[in-house]
Swiss-Prot record:
Signal peptide interval: none
Domain Radical SAM core per the UniProt entry, residue ranges: 108-385
Note: Reaction proceeds by a ping-pong mechanism involving intermediate methylation of a conserved cysteine residue.
Name of protein: Probable dual-specificity RNA methyltransferase RlmN
Similarity comment: family membership: Belongs to the radical SAM superfamily. RlmN family.
Cross-referenced Pfam families: Radical_SAM, RlmN_N
Cysteines engaged in disulfide bonds, as pairs: C115-C390
Annotated GO MF terms: 4 iron, 4 sulfur cluster binding; metal ion binding; rRNA (adenine(2503)-C2-)-methyltransferase activity; rRNA binding; tRNA (adenine(37)-C2)-methyltransferase activity; tRNA binding
Cellular component terms (Gene Ontology): cytoplasm
Amino acid sequence: MTALPVTNRDTLPNLYDLSLAEMERLLTDWGQPTYRARQVFRQLYVNLADTPLAMTDLPLALRERLANETRLAPVTPEQVQTADNGLTRKALFRLPNGALVESVLMIYLDRATVCVSTQAGCAMGCVFCATGTLGLLRNLSPGEIVAQVVWAAREMRRLAGRPPRPTMRQPEDDAWWSPDDLENDAPSVPEVSSVSHVTNIVFMGMGEPFATYDRWWRAVEIIHDPRGLNIGARSMTVSTVGLVPGIRRLATETLPINLAVSLHAPDDDLRSALMPINRRYPLAVLLDATRDYLAATGRRVSFEYVLLQGKNDEPEHAAKLAALLRGEAGPAGLPLHLVHVNLIPWNPVPGMPLGRSERRRVLTFQRILRERGIACTVRVERGVAIAAACGQLAGGVAC
């Protein structure tokens, strides 16, 4: 990445960084009544205005001052790619200083989910992930996180004005097929998506959210605000590689955000080889924090498990994973009614000497877990053809 010079506009306050209370303070400092802040907030997140000059319920002088003394960034992606008949849309954003981040909008029959990035690059170094090859370039500001959701909301509003579009019916839990199957003879039927707005957010894009917890959480609060985007807390999911302090902190928050933990191995030796963070927070420590989280919140945790051909997808790996979660191998077990394993066949990343698990191995792994009382599904990936699937985001950079 070539760093770009920071301009004077880049140093102006980003309106997407501000909560409603902070916006009220800004505008009252300008001599405006507090209700003006509510108008601006509504324009940003309900009307989805892309410039203060479009906020026509404000006095012209205030619109001009907002345009001159604040900014909205990033507003427009540099590139949008589509896949899955337009139902998957990946946006590439360029941030001040030139850093690139990606977001993915996935439209389903009954929901629209946006996968959001929290960092440009990532320092975690998981060996199967494209983002990790970049290293950490920088953390995103709260507003740069929020802006990705605003982009997705605009996309949904724009698409809602078109004729009904086909979507793919979700498969039964036992069904799984490859991306090639999806393009050729996918087990899907034409349906009409009735969704016209973003319904779900997954913080599973580029970066580790808990490594920039304060900024990420400020974004969550802005996104959740019922006077704006109004995305319910239970409709948001955050994924972590296993930063234990973040898991413990999330357990104390008032908003019930869903938690997903990237596991990917049933023992410390293999997990440390795949995920360097395991050397800092080994499985016993991670499961202890997860157990405390479950006790404090009563909310289900999803364990994500990327299946790598011949690395972590053997039947003995499945049996060891079940034993780990049940408490039969070292750490005390977890309450299984609050545990869900999400199997993810690895999505190819150019230059990585890894393989995607074959279908039969995936289904065998799933069967072994289920036979041992572990709830388990296989993720049907979206956007593989445009490098928008799990583990493929690299900010438009060829790996």
